[in-house]
Amino acid sequence: MGCAASKGDKSESHGRNEVSSWEPPNWDKEAGRLRDAIRGLGTDEISIVRVLARLTNRQRRKLLRVYKERFNEDLATVLETELRGAAKTVVDALLYTPEMYNVTSLKEAFESKDYDTVVSIIISSRNDSLMDMKEKYFAEFNKTLEDDLSKIPDKDVRHIVMSLLSVDRSSAKKRADKEAARIRATLLFNDGDILSLLCEKVGRNQLRETLAAFLELHRINIGQFIEEKCSTLSKKAQDTLKDCVLLIENPPQYFAKEMAKADELKILRMMVSRSEIDLYYIKKEFLSIYSRQLHDTIDKQCRFDYARLLIVILELRGQYSESAKKR
């Protein structure tokens, strides 16, 4: 096919997915709201999630510092003590940095042999995030991510994921070259090696332009093309390649389709991971594909203790102003 968690990490640098957002008028007031939700008559889980979800990841870290300064308590530790079950899982997800959340999710998926989730995390992550994840995975678990990826039972899928993980796009240009895209599209048509294209050291915009040129020049559905040219691969590997293409062409559509068949934990992971990127567009794609609202599906598809908290996140992070600034 070609192609050459520690809890302390909940307060480290957010990384590259920061989306500037609403600034609370009074940080002390936000810290006080959390304090009231925690110390009131019974822990108010909805209010805790509402305070955290209206903030970006970086703003949550500031709130952790303000809470410590005002009440002389470590908020993450307090929440760890006070929360149980779904609320603890959801709040943990909100407090992790994006890269550390992915690393933790990968480890949990490996332990439960949920290789579909492993593959989804790898193929949907930006190249710079993958590089960070590889470093953090080794630092956290004293083994390489590649070591655990070798456990993926489908050898074709394993090869695809390993190949994508080995690509360094740090020098890739952001602007697409249309003429180069047309030349590369013709080469793809002739050799049928979709994985080699996916593993080229070019940016996502160039890959998207190449796929668009492929359709324009050759009038062939890329999914059908993969089935024909990769017929010796397993069905799961073919589907993985199709997912890789969809993630280049239309990431929100990929996540909308994944959420439609996911349980509450997978929906949580995807919502939190995309909450500062394109959750707004995922909602729109979901409605377009399935003619129903995502929050209605969450309400029916997830256990109540998760659904009520996931809907809060969706309402707050799924607004245009919060998660529609990157396509």
Describe each region flagged by the PLM:
Residues 1-327:
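Long, charge-enriched amphipathic alpha-helical scaffolds and associated charged IDRs
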